[in-house]
Amino acid sequence: MAPFVHCSTGRPGRFTDGSYGIYYAGDSEEVAVAETIHHHQKFMSSTPQPPGWTSDFRVLVGSVDRALDDVNAVPDVLHPHDYTASQVEGHGLRGAGSDGLLWNSARMPGQRCIGIFWPNAITIPVQGRHYCYHWNGTRVDFVRQYDTGAVLAVT
């Protein structure tokens, strides 16, 4: 429920201006980590936070059994940084009653992401792996898996 109730115009996303929430997910744990690293870096670069292990992230595993709108062919919705066109597309699809959308990841070529507009369009997820991200003052350079203790370099 969190993505649907803790939305803010101060934290817009690819397919929302922040006035409504979207549950974003990747088709694999690797995609989800890559996407969250990108957004965490963007957030951290706007803060005076010193380098260190700054934030924990939990993988949530769920499933979707709904028809989602494929937006890969819509002009400009896959731009890696400018979300203007994708926010217009998301608003229009949600307003038309779409359950959600799917697209190719901007962070991991060949992988897919989904955005779900409504809480009842996804199963209640269960927690998977738990990560901590290391901020070096410029970017996320390492992630630590809590369950294994492994520290992985981010390239």
What are these regions (language model features)?
Residues 27-28, 97:
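Generic detector of short, well-ordered, non-transmembrane alpha-helical segments enriched
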Residues 1-16, 38-155:
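Active-site and NAD+-binding cores of ADP-ribose-processing enzymes
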Residues 28-29, 39:
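Alpha-helical transmembrane segments with an aromatic anchor "belt"
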